[in-house]
Swiss-Prot record:
It is found in: Membrane. The keyword Membrane applies. This is Solute carrier family 35 member E3. Keywords: Membrane, Transmembrane, Transmembrane helix. It comes from Mus musculus (Mouse). PANTHER family: SOLUTE CARRIER FAMILY 35. It is a multi-pass membrane protein.
């Protein structure tokens, strides 16, 4: 009876964690878009706020023994911290200059680009069926972008840069975690302050600092509260992702990611009144089909590899 109660409590915690991640992941997209549309807060400055709040949050977490920091050589993290800056800045610029649907769908191109990077630079091999799933993903993104009535050429440039830098960042994070034998929170504990310092130097060259429209310019209390809330929610997204990965299976994590993908798309069209044509709808369905089949094949191949290792004498 006790074990049943423990299982129920455990499942309840997982359900609560998934629900929390769903809320904050969707909230951060809509809140950032709201800040850009209604307050015009500068992009790099908002990213800087996110990094600083994330580092402060991680500092509090390590003081509460949620994770143990590990001493790491800063020289080995410079490129990773720089790519972290680029990944968040370009992703936010894509959100600022595109509809939420186009922004969200463009992010799906990260998978094909990661596969290309790992194939050409790391000589990693992928099965034919995995490679074939990249076709509907790519076709769907192109369809959606081509028929987007709010198509913004600069926005697509930012989206493309965001995809490339995000893909590099994700590949390098995996490599660094393996090389340095650290988890994502231990790595982020060093990345966040390093990336903050880099942006602190870069911001004055690209954005006004004390003038109107700058981070220290005259802002309303509501705008500043929204920016601070955005930073706190960004930290909560990182923390909840770490918790989900540690407490659920890869299948749960991936399937839940697809659910968030669909909810964010629908929310963007409802909240921001973004027009949706039939061809865009087909593009979204095409991309979603590609993502789902990719996940199915990838997870089945991973399970097959594990079973072979178990059977090996």
């Amino acid at each position: 009876m006790a074990s049943l109660a423990d299982r129920v409590r455990g499942n309840g915690r997982i359900a609560a964690g998934l629900l929390f991640n769903l809320l904050v992941s969707i909230c951060i997209v809509f809140l950032n878009k709201w800040i850009y549309v209604h307050h015009g807060f500068p992009n790099m400055s908002l990213t800087l706020v996110h990094f600083v709040v994330t580092w402060l949050g991680l500092y509090i977490c390590q003081k509460l023994n949620i994770f143990a920091p590990k001493s790491l050589p800063l020289s080995k993290l410079l490129l990773l911290a720089l790519s972290f800056c680029g990944f968040v800045v370009f992703t936010n610029l894509s959100l600022q200059n595109n509809t939420i649907g186009t922004y969200q769908l463009a992010k799906a191109m990260t998978t094909p680009v990661i596969i290309a990077i790992q194939t050409f630079w790391y000589q990693k091999r992928f099965s034919v069926r995995i490679q074939l799933t990249l076709i509907p993903i790519t076709v769907g993104v192109i369809l959606n972008s081509y028929y987007d009535v709010k198509f913004h050429s600069l926005g697509m440039v930012f989206a493309a840069l965001g995809v490339v830098v995000t893909s590099l960042y994700q590949v390098w994070v995996g490599a660094k975690q393996h090389e340095l034998q650290v988890n994502s929170m231990q790595l982020l504990y060093y990345q966040a302050p390093m990336s903050s310092a880099m942006l602190l130097v870069a911001v004055p060259f690209f954005e006004p600092v004390f003038a109107e429209g700058g981070i220290f310019g005259p802002w309303s209390v509501s705008a500043l509260l929204m920016v601070l809330l955005s930073g706190i929610i960004a930290f909560m997204v990182n923390l909840s992702i770490y918790w989900i990965i540690g407490n659920t299976s890869p299948v749960t994590y991936n399937m839940f990611g697809h659910f968030k993908f669909c909810i964010t798309l629908c929310g963007g069209y409802i909240l921001f009144k973004d027009p949706l044509s039939v061809n865009q709808g087909l593009g979204i369905l095409c991309t979603l089909f590609g993502i789902l089949t990719y996940t199915h094949f990838k997870l089945s191949e991973q399970e097959g590899s594990k079973s072979k290792l178990v059977q090996r004498p």
